[in-house]
């Protein structure tokens, strides 16, 4: 297994618990004589840290691994910045859910030691890339680990749009919006909209309409290498938005085209050896426990 010597730390701002965990993590890594680099925004709220700092954009170039302290949202932001560097990312959960940041703070030293000793799993999670075009010209571009969402923004009116997959017309829809999600994002917004849960190893994309004005509107799962095109109706009088992971936003105009496809670079997500995807789903989604007398 790959050995890690240069460790980057990213932390969610605005949380005392995150800062406490970052300090613990820093001490633990330094005690192992590792080179620690702080992302510059978290470094600003840790006076006297005495460590090298780096912008998030450059962190992937100087680190063997990056540890994210925060919730799933923190890891989503880190993933978009770090995927192009092919640097592994490990998450310590200081959020409310923790689908992606799966190390609990109370097990920080034990689990991080296992990873640093070479005992870990690596998952390659693909991202989506979205581009908004107007009159043939690109006006916005963003990446997403979870989902690309077309939504009305501040308006409460429905959106009319057409969907094309690999150049073939699929359907027109009138709905509150459309979610295009990766397997990683299938347990996020897409799940709330009635989409299926997809195992992270699947090479597939799910298209989930949001409150479609029809009884036949259902999610569609397509090949992960598909190119999706969403055309906003020219007859619209509102200006909907496109959001990537709920963090990057672009305003669309009637007639705009949104293209969504798989990003070439993938996120290398690290887990401890005892990571179990179904246990995560069972714990986070409140699935029932094993019945007495059930199978092993």
Curated annotation (Swiss-Prot):
<feature type="active site" description="Proton acceptor">
    <location>
        <position position="72"/>
    </location>
</feature>
<keyword id="KW-0418">Kinase</keyword>
<protein>
    <recommendedName>
        <fullName>NAD kinase</fullName>
        <ecNumber>2.7.1.23</ecNumber>
    </recommendedName>
</protein>
<dbReference type="InterPro" id="IPR002504">
    <property type="entry name" value="NADK"/>
</dbReference>
<feature type="binding site">
    <location>
        <position position="174"/>
    </location>
    <ligand>
        <name>NAD(+)</name>
    </ligand>
</feature>
<feature type="binding site">
    <location>
        <begin position="187"/>
        <end position="192"/>
    </location>
    <ligand>
        <name>NAD(+)</name>
    </ligand>
</feature>
<dbReference type="GO" id="GO:0006741">
    <property type="term" value="P:NADP biosynthetic process"/>
</dbReference>
<feature type="binding site">
    <location>
        <position position="157"/>
    </location>
    <ligand>
        <name>NAD(+)</name>
    </ligand>
</feature>
<feature type="binding site">
    <location>
        <begin position="146"/>
        <end position="147"/>
    </location>
    <ligand>
        <name>NAD(+)</name>
    </ligand>
</feature>
<dbReference type="InterPro" id="IPR017437">
    <property type="entry name" value="ATP-NAD_kinase_PpnK-typ_C"/>
</dbReference>
<feature type="binding site">
    <location>
        <position position="176"/>
    </location>
    <ligand>
        <name>NAD(+)</name>
    </ligand>
</feature>
<keyword id="KW-0808">Transferase</keyword>
<keyword id="KW-0520">NAD</keyword>
<keyword id="KW-0547">Nucleotide-binding</keyword>
<dbReference type="InterPro" id="IPR017438">
    <property type="entry name" value="ATP-NAD_kinase_N"/>
</dbReference>
<keyword id="KW-0067">ATP-binding</keyword>
<dbReference type="Pfam" id="PF01513">
    <property type="entry name" value="NAD_kinase"/>
</dbReference>
<feature type="binding site">
    <location>
        <position position="247"/>
    </location>
    <ligand>
        <name>NAD(+)</name>
    </ligand>
</feature>
<dbReference type="GO" id="GO:0005524">
    <property type="term" value="F:ATP binding"/>
</dbReference>
<keyword id="KW-0963">Cytoplasm</keyword>
<feature type="binding site">
    <location>
        <begin position="72"/>
        <end position="73"/>
    </location>
    <ligand>
        <name>NAD(+)</name>
    </ligand>
</feature>
<keyword id="KW-0521">NADP</keyword>
<dbReference type="GO" id="GO:0019674">
    <property type="term" value="P:NAD metabolic process"/>
</dbReference>
<dbReference type="GO" id="GO:0005737">
    <property type="term" value="C:cytoplasm"/>
</dbReference>
<dbReference type="InterPro" id="IPR016064">
    <property type="entry name" value="NAD/diacylglycerol_kinase_sf"/>
</dbReference>
<dbReference type="Pfam" id="PF20143">
    <property type="entry name" value="NAD_kinase_C"/>
</dbReference>
<dbReference type="GO" id="GO:0051287">
    <property type="term" value="F:NAD binding"/>
</dbReference>
<comment type="similarity">
    <text>Belongs to the NAD kinase family.</text>
</comment>
<dbReference type="GO" id="GO:0003951">
    <property type="term" value="F:NAD+ kinase activity"/>
</dbReference>
<comment type="function">
    <text>Involved in the regulation of the intracellular balance of NAD and NADP, and is a key enzyme in the biosynthesis of NADP. Catalyzes specifically the phosphorylation on 2'-hydroxyl of the adenosine moiety of NAD to yield NADP.</text>
</comment>
<dbReference type="GO" id="GO:0046872">
    <property type="term" value="F:metal ion binding"/>
</dbReference>
